[in-house]
Amino acid sequence: MFVSGEAIKFGGLDPKNAKVIVCHLGNGASVSAVKYGESVDTSMGLTPLEGLIMGTRSGDLDPAIISFLAEKEGMTASQVIDVCNKKSGVLGLSDGYSSDFRDLVQASETGNEQAKHALEAYAYRVGKYIGAYAAAMNGVDVIAFTAGVGENNAEVRAMIGEYIGYLGTNIDAERNKVRGEEIILSDEGSKVVTMVVPTNEELAIARKSAAIAEAGTDTYGNTFAK
């Protein structure tokens, strides 16, 4: 909610009417849909394994993969889950080359086809979730990139941008060169604003703690003296 709130302020929007998609893209990653100030969906499920392709996590898979690999490879369910968590994602798709997106971009630019494939699959999955959440909210006003990859990897942002142009946003190539700074990436003709919003988890925790202290009650209804 921190990033969506900052995106709304940066874009000069009314939080009661804004529809925001937050792409938290790091070694772990998720996409969230925030409608009128309330989170309505997120790509992660019971565990972080659901959703996007990540550094070492597979993201969405047919649950039958567990029984399939158990029978085919003689693996236990725990071993399959371990592979999905620690040996999959872009690491697996790049044939073990790297889970670091900087390495993958560099390798892709020098002709490593597996690294290129891993990045393309990653961007496709992010683009698919953005489209799904735009549909879920019946529109989107802002798409915000955040976290290590989202804030700093211009190449990955550009690849994702190729999948979301139909929404009415066009990422400006020059603006997209900026790394680690709050900036609007989309050009003036875009109907949907695409931006980078640096995350600040410490500030978010501090703000929430201050609000709880001021209210004298926490999220679960527990009260305490101010």
Set out the residue ranges of the language-model regions.
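Glycine-rich phosphate-binding loop of actin/hexokinase-like ATP-binding domains
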Residues: 1-72
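Conserved active-site and cofactor/substrate-binding residues in soluble primary-metabolism enzymes
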Residues: 2, 29, 60-64, 75, ...
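Alpha-helical scaffold segments in soluble metabolic enzymes
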Residues: 2-10, 65-69, 79, 83, ...
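Beta-strand segments within the central parallel beta-sheet cores of soluble alpha/beta enzyme folds
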Residues: 17-23, 78-87, 142-144
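Short, glycine-/Ser/Thr-/acidic-enriched flexible segments
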Residues: 27-28, 36-39, 98, 150-151, ...
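A mobile "lid/hinge" subdomain adjacent to the ATP/sugar-phosphate binding pocket shared
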Residues: 73-118
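Internal helix-turn-beta structural module
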Residues: 116, 120-141, 150-224
